[in-house]
């Protein structure tokens, strides 16, 4: 995305005029300006400079009396589902942006772009071309908190590789049918082993030159020796004391590269008489940190004891919407820090793979579920590859309502700390309203059972995808607002009601089904004994666990109930069509 389109040019604008403009603005360019009547094209050295040119010039600079427009140059065949939205208010809440984007269709992905400007920039992928076109028509120039949004297409490489579909197929949110083409980005992503989670490090800025080496010789040697791809993000956070490094390789390759980098920094510190301790700093997405720490900090303590290191983790308060990573600081010798890195990353990779498995299973249980748009999983900008979520299998689709029918609504009672009610509701009820719109669910908070009640019940009503979105955001909000400590994982209790005649099927013979359910989902599932069915002949099933565990358990129980309903329907059909002989 380093090729630029320059529009709204006067008839007399020459390549020299544009060269002077770019030089005056200190924006480098490569090659010649290709000038046409009213517009021109030029290449920047990289995507970062292209973004700076857009921010500095578009709608801000006049040439021969006309205000010029600068955008990414996008071939017509690649103007499909991907948009870039600029000039977003810097303190805008994520839920507000979410709900605004969702008005025009299914948002498959939304990632922030690093820029030097005060305002935010995001790249958005919509579910289809029409949704993106509608969004660009409605949002370009849209006033949001006194900021005028700027929206333009960015290249959609997938659109260029796929032939146009003659007939629309499937429901909104479904991807292409059949496997992706060989060589396509999605094919590559699907084949990528899930263990290939990159290692993200923070290194002092003064050592970056030594790590790169003269004309890049040192970094090339490391990549060759470890069979890895190493990105040093020098341009991020200009003037910062530390720079992130992303290492893509096998777990062994990442660890070897990490150790070599630590050795280079130590040697450079000795040569420059730098006396301060240089700890190993690892960046990890907040989603994984709770499991790394473990219950009461046991996992972290064990790593410290086994590796003879001191490990600290940055506080939750340091997190922002666009920076969901925590800094894990490891102090010790190079050898002990290297051992600690292996153990820390092993735990993070396990958590990542478990979440991938849970999310993929969710996609099979809820066909068309758009996981990337939920904001519940690390974006690729954090250095962790996004999960490859395929469309549902035929077997899963068979249990889903036929096209044209709405999925059945469910009611879940989720119990949250009583002190968290204000955060969930928000000022004048704004947060709960935004959450309800975003998820497409009815969300109500039941009155407290008493003045000293420690828990409050949130009643969520909506189809499976709405449940997933609403509950996921509630879990996230509780963690974000520090209602659970930095060493705690958010675990909540959810209640769902099932017909009393189906409770036995949930439990299974000798408790077999409920035990299998707990093993599969890692959630605690309890069907209290001796329950008196309510006026609708229903009993409560209690589910306790972290978000993915709780969701999987809910889906599996709903699957059991759907199976029971189908069997009942079949029996009714048989009885009405072919009367069964009575037993004597």
Curated annotation (Swiss-Prot):
Composition bias, Polar residues: 184-194
Residue segments, region Disordered: 160-199
MF terms (GO), sorted A to Z: mRNA 3'-UTR binding; N6-methyladenosine-containing RNA reader activity
Pfam assignment, any one: RRM_1
Residue ranges of domain KH in the record: 196-261, 277-344, 409-474, 491-557
Biological process per Gene Ontology, one example term: regulation of translation
CDD domains, per database record: KH-I_IGF2BP1_rpt1 (cd22490), KH-I_IGF2BP3_rpt3 (cd22498), RRM1_IGF2BP3 (cd12627), RRM2_IGF2BP3 (cd12630)
Main location per the UniProt record: cytoplasm
Signal peptide positions on this chain: none
Keyword Chloroplast: no
PROSITE patterns noted in UniProt: KH_TYPE_1, RRM
Residues annotated as domain RRM: 2-75, 81-156
Keyword annotations of the record: Cytoplasm, mRNA transport, Nucleus, Repeat, RNA-binding, Translation regulation, Transport
Domain of life: Eukaryota
GO annotation, cellular component aspect: cytoplasm; cytoplasmic stress granule; cytosol; nucleus; P-body
Location(s) in or outside the cell: Cytoplasm; Nucleus; Cytoplasm, P-body; Cytoplasm, Stress granule
Known function: RNA-binding factor that may recruit target transcripts to cytoplasmic protein-RNA complexes (mRNPs). This transcript 'caging' into mRNPs allows mRNA transport and transient storage. It also modulates the rate and location at which target transcripts encounter the translational apparatus and shields them from endonuclease attacks or microRNA-mediated degradation. Preferentially binds to N6-methyladenosine (m6A)-containing mRNAs and increases their stability.
Domains (record comment): All KH domains contribute binding to target mRNA. Domains KH3 and KH4 are the major RNA-binding modules, although KH1 and KH2 also contribute. They are also required for RNA-dependent homo- and heterooligomerization. The integrity of KH domains seems not to be required for localization to stress granules.
Family: Belongs to the RRM IMP/VICKZ family.
Subunit structure: Homodimer and multimer.
Name under which the protein is recorded: Insulin-like growth factor 2 mRNA-binding protein 3
Lineage: Eukaryota, Metazoa, Chordata, Craniata, Vertebrata
């Amino acid at each position: 995305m380093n090729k630029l389109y320059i529009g709204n040019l006067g008839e007399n604008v020459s390549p020299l005029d544009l060269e002077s403009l770019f030089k005056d603005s200190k924006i480098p360019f490569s090659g010649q300006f290709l000038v046409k009547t009213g517009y021109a094209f030029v290449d920047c050295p990289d995507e970062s400079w292209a973004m700076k040119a857009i921010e500095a010039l578009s709608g801000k600079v006049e040439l021969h009396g006309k205000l010029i427009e600068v955008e990414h140059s996008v071939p017509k065949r690649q103007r499909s589902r991907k948009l870039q939205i600029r000039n977003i208010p810097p303190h805008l809440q994520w839920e507000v942006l979410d709900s605004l984007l969702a008005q025009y269709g299914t948002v498959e992905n939304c990632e922030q772009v690093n820029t030097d400007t005060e305002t935010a920039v995001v790249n958005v992928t919509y579910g289809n071309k029409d949704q993106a076109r509608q969004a660009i028509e409605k949002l370009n120039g849209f006033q949001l908190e006194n900021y005028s949004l700027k929206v333009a297409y960015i290249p959609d490489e997938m659109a260029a590789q796929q032939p146009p579909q003659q007939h629309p197929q499937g429901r909104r949110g479904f991807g292409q049918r059949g496997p992706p083409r060989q060589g396509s980005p999605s094919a590559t992503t699907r084949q990528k082993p899930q263990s290939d989670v990159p290692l993200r490090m923070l290194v002092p800025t003064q050592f970056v030159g030594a790590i790169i080496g003269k004309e890049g010789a040192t970094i090339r040697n490391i990549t060759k020796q470890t069979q890895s791809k190493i990105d040093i993000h020098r341009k991020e956070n200009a003037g910062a004391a530390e720079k992130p490094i992303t290492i893509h390789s096998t777990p062994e390759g990442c660890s070897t590269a990490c150790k070599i980098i630590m050795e280079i920094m130590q040697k450079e510190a000795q040569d420059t008489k730098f006396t301060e301790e240089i700890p190993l700093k690892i960046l990890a997405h907040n989603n994984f940190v709770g499991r790394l720490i473990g219950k009461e900090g046991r996992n972290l303590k064990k790593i410290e004891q086994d590796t003879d290191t001191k490990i600290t983790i940055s506080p939750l308060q340091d997190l922002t919407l666009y920076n969901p990573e925590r800094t894990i600081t490891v102090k010790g010798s190079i050898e002990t820090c290297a051992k600690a890195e292996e153990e820390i990353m092993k735990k993070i990779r396990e958590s990542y793979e478990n979440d991938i498995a849970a999310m993929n299973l969710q996609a099979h249980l809820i066909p068309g579920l758009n996981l990337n748009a939920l904001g519940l999983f690390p974006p690729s900008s954090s250095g962790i590859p996004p999960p490859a979520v395929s469309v549902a299998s035929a077997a899963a689709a068979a249990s889903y309502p036929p096209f044209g029918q709405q999925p059945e609504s469910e009611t879940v009672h989720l119990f949250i700390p009583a002190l968290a009610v204000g955060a969930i509701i928000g000022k004048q009820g704004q947060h709960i309203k935004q959450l309800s719109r975003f998820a497409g669910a009815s969300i109500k908070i039941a009155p407290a059972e008493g003045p000293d009640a420690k828990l409050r019940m949130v009643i969520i009503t909506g189809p499976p995808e709405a449940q997933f979105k609403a509950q996921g955001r509630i879990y996230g909000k509780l963690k974000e607002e520090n209602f659970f400590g930095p060493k705690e994982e958010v675990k909540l209790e959810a209640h769902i009601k099932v017909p009393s005649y189906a409770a036995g099927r949930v439990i299974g013979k000798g408790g077999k089904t409920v035990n299998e359910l707990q093993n599969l989902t890692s959630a605690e599932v309890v069907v209290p004994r001796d329950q008196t069915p309510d006026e609708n002949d229903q009993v409560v099933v209690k589910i306790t666990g972290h978000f993915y565990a709780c969701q999987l358990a809910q889906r599996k129980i709903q699957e059991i109930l759907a199976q029971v309903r189908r069997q009942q329907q079949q029996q009714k059909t048989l009885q009405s069509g072919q009367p069964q002989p009575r037993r004597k």
